[in-house]
Amino acid sequence: MKVWMAILISILCWQSSVWAVCPAWSPARAQEEISRLQQQIKQWDDDYWKEGKSEVEDGVYDQLSARLTQWQRCFVSEPRDVMMPPLNGAVMHPVAHTGVRKMADKNALSLWMRERSDLWVQPKVDGVAVTLVYRDGKLNKAISRGNGLKGEDWTQKVSLISAVPQTVSGPLANSTLQGEIFLQREGHIQQQMGGINARAKVAGLMMRQGNSDTLNSLAVFVWAWPDGPQLMTDRLKELATAGFTLTQRYTRAVKNADEVARVRNEWWKAKLPFVTDGVVVRGAKEPESRHWLPGQAEWLVAWKYQPVAQVAEVKAIQFAVGKSGKISVVASLAPVMLDDKKVQRVNIGSVRRWQEWDIAPGDQILVSLAGQGIPRIDDVVWRGAERTKPTPPENRFNPLTCYFASDVCQEQFISRLVWLGSKQVLGLDGIGEAGWRALHQTHRFEHIFSWLLLTPEQLQNTPGIAKSKSAQLWHQFNLARNQPFTRWVMAMGIPLTRAALNASDERSWSQLLFSTEQFWQQLPGTGSGRARQVIEWKENAQIKKLGSWLAAQQITGFEP
């Protein structure tokens, strides 16, 4: 009971922060903002009904209408709907849930399919993932996906879902199945009806206390039988015989991306018994289940439907200075859900791009997901009545600034630390931007390599660094001393690709300093412009000072 209550409280807190945050407006400001949006929506209505034209996309109209309602309700404190977060737990899965890699488009899918055979397409059913464990012919355990390795014990709940077979026989008598618990629908047309918040509804039903009859509105779509029959046709037949009929009905053999596209489009427009958000293409040949790990499934991919764009309020405009000195602009957003992702930030780009967009805090922007699930701005759909735009920092930075710390160099200096600690450079595991900020704030680094001098005691006493991780971090810092010379040169920001640097065969600092512009220019992917940049870099006073400091620390390749 206490566990469920804690989960419920966290849901309510999360939900209220996402959906029920009201603008911090004075009564006069609220009246002005509401009145302006009201007038705009009325104008759109008049254009549509009186003149038969639409100046705004349906989705934008619907969401701005909902935003107007939200603003109006903010002043009478009406509650919002609950959105359920993902569930985690402590029950170990017999077989890990791998997850599925998403294909950006049909071309990407075609490339993936080219080297594979015996492929099958299934709908990507929108619900919550579950493991079903059968032992001696009976349902022994049901576990929520959680983090892929561990999840919640859902056995009691799943045993009350009449659509889930409680007993099985034959090859399934001692088996582990993976699938999706979904909300049963009658003739759901995805193209017309959308997602209807199905995942949150299923999660809500699975979390609700008591033996509710509403669980009978759920069913399961089995999409994996680890260590099951080798032939997909045999798997489907056995599953159907046991009562998992939907798997056989909605699994089709495909040979290429064109066939997948046809099925995907068919299911997008067809009447289905569940909500979907795309399709999954999987190979019948799978590795043994003991090799399954989260995020490492190479035998299946997903091709999702185009995500729905969302209108989001801009809460703040922030500026960041990258390691190369370029200033980028980021919009902090009131959280919105896009394709089951909570989006709170979107990259605008350069200062010039931000000025072209003319975005200020309080504006409403249309956000969607680009490839790889990265949020992007599609449009500015509404600008607030009172608009104050922050002043960007002076453009005083470049690729050769901020190797040494100073007040004006704070952001670029931190960006350099994040870069040198990344996997492709010095590989300092266990520390990111927040950790670097904590270390620099406490120990006031002189330059980007000052962390090499930190003692275990200093790390242990650093606010923001967990004491349990301080020893591991100190170990990582010491291991970095043994990294190859080229890694240290990359950490110093040499303007070369790793391939070009490796091809140079430079193995010492003295050798690098004596290399000519002509030498650098002959490297792969390095033209005259890049070669000149390398010369400017190695002749920079800060770089020379860092090289001498690393030599004093006896870093490989830098010693005299």
From Swiss-Prot:
Q: Name one GO molecular function term.
A: DNA ligase (NAD+) activity
Q: Which UniProt keywords apply?
A: DNA damage, DNA repair, DNA replication, Ligase, NAD
Q: Which reaction does it catalyse?
A: NAD(+) + (deoxyribonucleotide)n-3'-hydroxyl + 5'-phospho-(deoxyribonucleotide)m = (deoxyribonucleotide)n+m + AMP + beta-nicotinamide D-nucleotide
The record's annotation in Gene3D superfamilies points to: DNA ligase/mRNA capping enzyme, Helix hairpin bin, Nucleic acid-binding proteins
Q: Which residues cross the membrane?
A: none
- What is the top EC class of this enzyme, as a single word? ligase
Q: What is this protein called?
A: DNA ligase B
> What organism is recorded for this protein?
Shigella flexneri serotype 5b (strain 8401)
The gene from which this protein is expressed is ligB
